[in-house]
Amino acid sequence: MVKNSFISVISQEKKEENKGSVEFQVFNFNNKIRILTSHLELHRKDYSSQRGLRKILGKRQRLLSYLSKKNRVRYKELIGQLGILEQKAR
């Protein structure tokens, strides 16, 4: 498995920032999601990895929800950089 292929230019910018920031955490969750997704394409019956993927997706969604409430501009910028679809309003 090639982990370095998912790291982009954003990682270079984020190394200088606070690792506890919401953007950095979402970026790390995004990389983990891509890695787990490629793993599950090969191992479809790996249910523990499926559960882990769902947990990470939930964590990322909660962080994005928090960011959209606190700072809409940073939220829009982040989802634009990572290529994440905007969440629908309920």
UniProtKB/Swiss-Prot annotation:
A single MF term (Gene Ontology): structural constituent of ribosome
CDD domains named among the record's database cross-references: Ribosomal_S15p_S13e (cd00353)
Annotated keywords: Chloroplast, Plastid, Ribonucleoprotein, Ribosomal protein
Domain of life where this protein originates: Eukaryota
GO CC aspect terms: chloroplast; ribonucleoprotein complex; ribosome
Location in or out of the cell: Plastid, Chloroplast
Record GO biological process: translation
Cited HAMAP family: Ribosomal_uS15_B
Family membership noted in the UniProt record: Belongs to the universal ribosomal protein uS15 family.
Protein name: Small ribosomal subunit protein uS15c
Organism: Buxus microphylla
Lineage: Eukaryota, Viridiplantae, Streptophyta, Embryophyta, Tracheophyta
Gene this protein is translated from: rps15
